């Protein structure tokens, strides 16, 4: 089995998660320069800012980098074209089926790596010609599925023949080793990079993350079909109570 760094041309078998409103071109470049695959998170951008961030990333690194596209984004079609025009090396996708874009991306030489939360979705996507798949467990930050990383990864490995990348709750070398033992070729990490000097979030947010323990996150939005793992604070607790008391409210 080839490791992820051999597939992507990076130093380490690590992808930086494409976190919306956080993973800018500058942050992605820093991650690529450190030996991972930096990913620009297009989720909080429009078409113009995405293009600007791609070009800024290219100014700051000569290493491979990619773009994450959330397919429910209203400008997903434009994003799909921009990554071709800007000759991005890798596209990761979430929140939808990338099928209508895969042939265009592949023709442009782009590696296509969707994020999945279930083996059935991985099986559905493999015939489209994807290069790998990210199996993301419920331990991850942000939008989550229901299956744990430990349970999900080997099921996806058994379900598809393309390389599988583990994600969700991975923060150190022990968890990377565990992912490889489960059959993954590498890992995607996000939350553990938030406290880095290069990450553009507010220092108070970094301090809260560093202070947080194993019971300091909460998943909101399950009752409205949009589960999201966030830090516990007054707002997330209140939001969780609203979802429980008014489950059909959107």
Could you describe each region identified by the protein language model?
Residues 22, 170-171:
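Residue-level detector of alpha-helix initiation sites
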Residues 151-161, 165, 171-245, 249-250:
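Conserved active-site-proximal phosphate/metal-binding subdomains
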Residues 1-163:
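Active-site entrance/lid segments in N-terminal catalytic domains of soluble metabolic enzymes
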């Amino acid at each position: 089995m080839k490791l992820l760094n051999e597939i992507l041309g990076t130093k380490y078998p690590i992808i930086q998660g494409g976190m919306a409103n956080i993973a800018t071109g500058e942050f992605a470049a820093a991650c690529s320069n450190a030996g991972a695959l930096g990913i620009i998170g297009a989720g909080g951008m429009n078409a113009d800012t995405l293009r600007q961030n791609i070009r800024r990333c290219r100014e700051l690194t000569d290493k491979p980098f990619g773009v994450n596209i959330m397919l429910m984004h209203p400008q997903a079609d434009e994003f799909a074209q921009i990554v071709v025009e800007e000759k991005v090396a890798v596209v990761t996708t979430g929140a939808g089926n990338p099928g209508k874009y895969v042939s265009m991306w592949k023709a442009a030489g782009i590696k296509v790596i969707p994020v999945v939360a279930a083996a059935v979705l991985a099986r559905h996507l493999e015939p489209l010609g994807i290069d790998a798949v990210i199996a993301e467990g419920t331990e991850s930050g942000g939008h989550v599925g229901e299956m744990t990383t430990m349970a999900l990864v080997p099921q996806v490995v058994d379900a598809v023949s393309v390389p599988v990348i583990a994600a969700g709750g991975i923060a150190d070398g022990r968890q990377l080793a565990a992912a490889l033992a489960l059959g993954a070729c590498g890992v995607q990490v996000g939350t553990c990079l938030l406290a880095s000097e290069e990450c553009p979030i507010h220092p108070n947010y970094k301090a809260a993350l560093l202070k947080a323990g194993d019971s300091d996150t909460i998943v909101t939005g399950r009752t409205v079909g949009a589960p999201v793992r966030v830090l516990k604070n007054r707002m997330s607790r209140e939001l969780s109570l609203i979802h429980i008391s008014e489950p059909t409210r959107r």
